[in-house]
Every structure is written in C-alpha cells, then in structure tokens.
Design a protein with these regions (language model features):
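C-terminal ends and interior cores of transmembrane alpha-helices
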Residues: 89-109
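Intracellular juxtamembrane helix-capping segments at the cytosolic ends
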Residues: 129-143
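Structural signature of the two symmetry-related core transmembrane helices
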Residues: 81-96, 187
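Loop-to-transmembrane helix entry/capping segments in MFS-fold secondary transporters
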Residues: 49, 143-155
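Helix-to-loop junctions at the C-terminal end of transmembrane segments
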Residues: 66-78, 174-175
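Intrinsic disorder in cytosolic terminal tails and internal cytosolic loops
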Residues: 2, 200-246
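Helix-loop boundary and gating motifs at the non-cytosolic
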Residues: 20, 31-48, 52
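A membrane-interface helix-boundary motif in multi-pass transporters
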Residues: 172-190
Length: 246
C-alpha cells in the first residue's frame, strides 16, 4: 500500500491560496519572536524565574487546549473568518496585556497584579497558537487531496522563511518602544494577517472541499509528519507477485 502524493511548486501553492502563503510567512515571524523573546520580555519586566516559567507554561497549555474548540469552529464556518477573528482577537489581547503589564496607565493595585497579565496572556495564546493548523486547513480547501502533503511542505517552508526574521524585527520594536514593544510587535503582525484576510474575502468566494478538515499540527512538523494526517488516505496499488526459484 502506497500513498499517492503529487508535487506542488511554491508558485502553484501561491496561486491556489495567496492568503495561506501570506499568513504562513507572517505567522512564522510571529511564532519565532514569541518563543525566543518571551523570556527576554519577562526578564526585562522583572519577572522572577518562577513567574517566567509560569508564563511559558501558560503559552504552551493554552495553545494545546485551543486546538479543539478552534478546530471544531473552523470545520463549521468559513476558515478565513475564523483566522481573521483569531488574529484580531490575538491583536486585541496583546494590546490589553500591555495595559496590565505594570508599566502603563492603570492604577497600581490593578496594573501590578500579575493575575490580570496571566489571564489576558492566556486569551492571547488561545487565539494565536492554533493559527498554523488553521492556515493549513484553509489552504487544503483550495487544492485536491493528493497535494495535501506537498502544500503542507510548502507552507512549512514559507513559515520557516518568516521565522528567520521574527526575533530580529521584534528586537527592533523592543529597542524603540521598550519592553512592551514585544506586544506591540505581536499586535502589528497579527493585525496584518487579519487585514489581508479581509481583503482576500472581498476578492474570492469561499469553496467547499469535503476532503479538507482541521487537524491540529505543530509548527515544527515535517513533510513526513504531514503524511500521517489521518485524512490522507492510502491508495491501493497492485503489487506484482513474482515467483523466484531459490
């Protein structure tokens, strides 16, 4: 039993789903900055080692839990709408997190309460972390099933290209704005994805692809891992039976 997998160039992938490639690139920028500079941000905000550990734990667990409800919603409604809602939700919570970070604008009793920071950071992570799986499922809506693996590999490559610039760009934001430049950066790039999604909805109709559905995927998955997607069914091919004398 073998799986039939057809190749797909990056140009073909872009023509099939411009929004998928665009959002994959900039989500790579977001994710690399988020996971590399979160501890730097927390240290600059005078978090203790325990508090930094709590923040990184909340980031991971929120993203894992969010996969299930977000995936279910995306299989019912237009995935572009779900991506747009998630990105703008993450952008809004990123800005709110600035206000409860202890640096700005709120009364001391509220601003310095890390409980508020944790709460809004959880909501931010809940909106942001399922994004790659959503992007992959959205892209699959516009291609045939035999190209799912090739499309996933192309999106992973595009994600990696974006990831190379994330820490550098985010550090510029933090250098110009201060520690909270970290969340300003996250606000800007999430909003950029959401804005492009709105534009794409105006120029292209939604399609129904019964072969495409949300499957939770990590950002670091390889093309070989994408082949394990349970929706990619094997195709039976005849195996020649050769009798050989020994």
């Amino acid at each position: 039993t073998f799986k039939k997998i057809n190749a797909m160039s990056l140009n073909e992938l872009y023509k099939s789903s411009p929004f998928g490639m665009f959002s994959s690139f900039f989500y790579g920028t977001i994710q690399s900055a988020l996971f590399t500079l979160l501890a730097v941000y927390a240290t600059s905000m005078n978090f203790t080692i325990l508090e930094i550990s709590i923040v990184t734990f909340l980031l991971a667990i929120s993203g894992a839990v969010a996969q299930f409800p977000v995936g279910k919603i995306s299989d019912v409604y237009d995935r572009r709408k779900v991506i747009i809602a998630s990105t703008f939700g993450a952008a809004i919570f990123a800005i709110i997190t600035i206000f409860v970070s202890g640096q700005m604008y709120l009364p001391d009793g509220l601003a310095t309460s890390k409980t508020w920071f944790y709460m809004f950071f959880i909501l931010f992570s809940f909106c942001s972390l399922p994004m790659f799986s959503l992007i992959l499922a959205h892209t699959n809506d516009y291609i045939t099933k035999d190209k799912f693996v090739a499309a996933g590999a192309g999106l992973q490559f595009t994600f990696g290209l974006g990831a190379m610039s994330g820490p550098f760009l985010c550090s510029i934001f933090m250098d110009l704005v201060g520690s909270n430049g970290f969340f300003v950066f996250l606000f800007f790039f999430h909003s950029l994805i959401g804005a492009f999604g709105i534009y794409r909805m105006r120029v292209r109709e939604t399609v129904e692809n019964p072969d495409s559905q949300f499957v939770a995927m990590p950002q670091t998955i390889t093309p070989a891992g994408i082949e394990l997607n349970p929706t990619t069914e094997p195709i039976e091919e005849p195996i020649k039976d050769e009798n050989r004398e020994i």
